[in-house]
A protein has these predicted regions:
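Bacterial Sec-dependent N-terminal signal peptides
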Residues: 1-30
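A structural signal for beta-strand register positions
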Residues: 105, 110, 136, 164, ...
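Extracellular beta-rich repeat passengers
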Residues: 233, 238-419
Length: 483
């Protein structure tokens, strides 16, 4: 068989595989379309997550890490549950906050005042059916914890919405080898580069992937690398309408095959098939000059494969050539084998779960304006990160990155920090008096009366609202988010 014939056969097989996958996925999407969304603005593969719907309401009334009225009490409880906040401020965790029991909704938008921040230890999602909205996780180096700020691995039906994660010692947010997940409208910023990681300088954005996973409208800012890294055997991944700002020596990379003897437990697949569509890439002061400055992705050869990549519609600020054709210099595999570029490129996207997609330029405006824990209001950290992304300039730096890596102009602050102290540490989050809730069902008395409910009946929040697929409690929580 000659080389041209082999190439045609390989292309035909890839086309047939994509068509078969498309038929299966469209049937799956049609069936799931009959289910209620996690909340009205939920999109992507995690949008049908049930969370704590219809379950018990836990009120967080203290910033202590443990005991009655604590966030930890609610997280460690069993059964369907929704967590609402009657206080704002920063919770200094004494150990990892591990979500081990399924069916939970954490509604950070309910906090009265400036919102909630978790400090000191990571949040680890080790359960299915998890909804987390409007929460900050800013790890820091005080506890010498070598961890991601937020992580999920080996679980299904998870949606993270409007999370602000930063100051991690390992990756900032890592969500991979999962199934049916969405990460949307999050700010993932300022991992700690020269901190206390056992491997030395670290400070990465995250490892992302998951078989049937959606990552959209996120701001990834000021990490040296893994912006993000696609896990080996990431599965079917849809990455669109994100903003990547001020990467250091690498932007997106990874995506090779997973070794068949890999040890990850659930949802393990060998392949990576990814759409990278309509994202906005904006190099910053830390971004290495040369090819890295216009690098969309650096597909990584692993176990004989670089994955399959559909890349289109992305803007690379500063490179008209790459913006006009993302494959003209924007895709830079780490293998020099001549067949690699042809083998990884898909000319049509895999048929992912649709979202309300924007152009890359419109996504930039939306993300910098709305992403992160913006309810009850953005904190000073997110305000600064969004402003830096808009201006293309960073305000702070640590001592390590500039000494180790090439920058276009070392007179500028790199934006890559070693400690949260480099940027002033955790901002104060003030609390205000929460609205009266006589029956402690998560809905204020005045809202219940307005909707014909009884402020003395703790059970009516679990009732399905008239003309809605949601419970009354869910309707209230969504109203806080303008939905």
């Amino acid at each position: 068989m000659n080389k041209n014939h082999k190439t045609r056969v390989k292309a035909l097989l890839l086309l047939l595989l994509t068509m078969a996958q498309g038929t299966t996925l469209m049937a799956q999407n049609a069936a799931e379309a009959q289910l209620p969304l996690a909340f009205p603005s939920a999109e992507g593969y995690g949008k049908y997550t049930v969370g704590g719907r219809g379950g018990k309401v836990y009120e967080v009334t203290t910033l202590e890490d443990g005991g009655q009225g604590s966030l930890r009490e609610a997280v460690e409880a069993e059964g369907p549950r929704t967590v609402v906040f009657r206080v704002s401020g920063t919770i200094s965790l004494k150990r990892q906050l591990r979500i081990s029991n399924p069916y939970i909704t954490i509604a950070g938008q309910t906090a009265p005042g400036d919102g909630i921040c978790l400090r000191g230890y990571p949040v680890s999602i080790n359960a299915d059916q998890v909804i987390i909205r409007y929460l900050r996780v800013r790890l820091g180096d005080e506890t010498k914890t070598e961890a991601d700020a937020v992580s999920a691995r080996g679980h299904k039906n998870i949606i993270l919405d409007h999370i602000s994660a930063s100051w991690s010692v390992d990756e900032t947010m890592s969500v991979y080898h999962c199934d049916s997940i969405t990460v949307q409208w999050c700010i993932i910023s300022e991992s700690l580069f020269g901190s206390n990681h056992i491997k030395g300088a670290h400070g990465f954005g995250g490892i992302w992937g998951g078989n049937y996973s959606s990552f959209h409208h996120n701001l990834i800012a000021s990490h040296s690398s893994r912006n993000p890294r696609l896990a080996g055997g990431a599965g079917f991944v849809d990455f669109r309408n994100n903003v990547i700002f001020n990467w250091g020596f690498n932007s997106i990379y990874g995506g090779g095959a997973l070794h068949k003897n890999g040890s990850d437990p659930t949802f393990l697949v060998r392949h990576t098939t990814v759409n990278i569509v309509n994202n906005y890439f904006k190099p910053g002061p830390a971004t290495a000059p040369g090819e890295v400055s216009h690098r969309i992705a650096n597909p990584s050869w692993a176990n004989g494969d670089c994955g399959k990549w559909y890349v289109a519609g992305n803007i690379m600020e500063g490179s008209e050539r790459v913006t006009a054709d993302n494959w003209d210099g924007g895709i830079q595999p780490n293998s020099s084998l001549p067949q690699v570029m042809d083998s990884i490129r898909m000319n049509v996207p895999w048929p992912s779960m649709p979202i309300a997609m924007q152009s890359a330029s419109h996504a930039f405006d939306s993300v910098t304006e709305r992403a992160g824990a913006s309810l009850p209001r953005r904190d000073k950290v997110d305000e600064r990160i969004a402003k830096e992304a808009c201006l293309g300039q960073t305000s702070f730096e640590g001592n390590t990155y500039k000494a180790k890596h090439t920058m276009k102009d070392k007179r500028l602050a790199s934006g890559i920090i070693d400690s949260q102290q480099d940027v002033g540490g955790w901002p104060e989050l003030k609390s205000t008096t929460p609205p009266p809730d006589t029956d402690h069902d998560g809905m204020p008395d005045v809202w219940e009366r307005r909707h014909g409910l009884n402020p003395d009946d703790p059970a009516d929040g679990a009732l399905t609202a008239a003309g809605s697929p949601y419970t009354y409690l869910e309707v209230y929580l969504s109203s806080l988010a303008g939905e």
